Regions:
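A charged helix-plus-loop insertion that forms the helical arch/lid used to bind
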Residues: 54-81, 127-136
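Short beta-strand segments
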Residues: 9-11, 46-47, 89, 108-113
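N-terminal glycine-/serine-/threonine-rich phosphate-binding loop
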Residues: 1-46, 55-62
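Internal, active-site/partner-interface "lid" segment
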Residues: 107-123
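Phosphate/diphosphate-binding glycine-rich loops and adjacent basic-rich segments that engage nucleotide
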Residues: 123-173
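Active-site loop-to-helix "anion-binding N-cap" substructures in soluble metabolic enzymes
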Residues: 2-4, 14-17, 21-24, 62-69, ...
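Short, active-site-adjacent cap segments at secondary-structure transitions
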Residues: 14-16, 50-54, 115-119
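Conserved small/polar residues in nucleotide/adenosyl-binding loops
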Residues: 178-181
């Protein structure tokens, strides 16, 4: 009998908003994943990266202020960076938890890209909140660069992005290789 595939989705802020919080959250997730593996499941994990991609984007922008010879990192690159380090933390924590239980199964991270419709309605009204809290002055600076900002209920500001509906996962065939019996 083949193992059942279980998909675990770690939603918005499930991994925390700072690197120390993420380390704690990935260890907690690793225990739950190891429980599923012990129960005979093959596990695929999907995760959000909003807080992390915002943090990376902010860090890259701040770095650019003191090192102008470095090129600005577009959001797509920041997203890939966040997938890489989230995947690394999850992969490391899951592998360690499995080994501590005497389970020796491969654990891998796959970075993914999606194809979107460039005319998706989400571009007309961006609403995915990312990054740190901005002052009013910082919000105005972001808007002057062509970025979208929203004022939150508490009077603070944050960057927002469009979140168009994915049409296709570019690496789907690779993902399917890992879920085949």
């Amino acid at each position: 009998m083949s193992e059942k595939i279980t998909v675990v989705a770690l939603g918005h802020r499930a991994l925390g908003t700072t690197l120390p919080e993420q380390k704690i959250a990935t260890k907690k997730a690793a225990k739950a994943v190891a429980d599923l593996v012990e129960a005979g499941n093959r596990v695929v994990i999907s995760h959000s990266n909003g807080p992390q991609v915002g943090m990376i984007h902010t860090a890259m922008n701040e770095f650019g202020k003191t090192h102008p010879d470095y090129t600005f990192a577009p959001m797509s690159v920041c997203s890939a960076m966040s997938q890489g380090y989230i995947g690394y933390d999850l992969q490391t924590a899951i592998r360690a938890e499995l080994i501590s239980r005497g389970i020796y199964k491969p654990v891998a991270t796959i970075l993914t890209q999606v194809v979107i419709d460039p005319y998706d309605d989400a571009f007309a009204e961006p609403e995915k909140i990312i990054g740190r809290v901005l002052t009013e002055e910082e919000a105005e600076t972001e808007e002057s660069k062509g970025n979208f900002v929203t004022k939150l209920a508490d009077g603070t500001y944050k960057r927002i992005l469009a979140a168009p509906k994915p049409q296709k996962i570019v690496e789907l065939e690779t993902c399917l290789l890992y879920t085949s019996p």
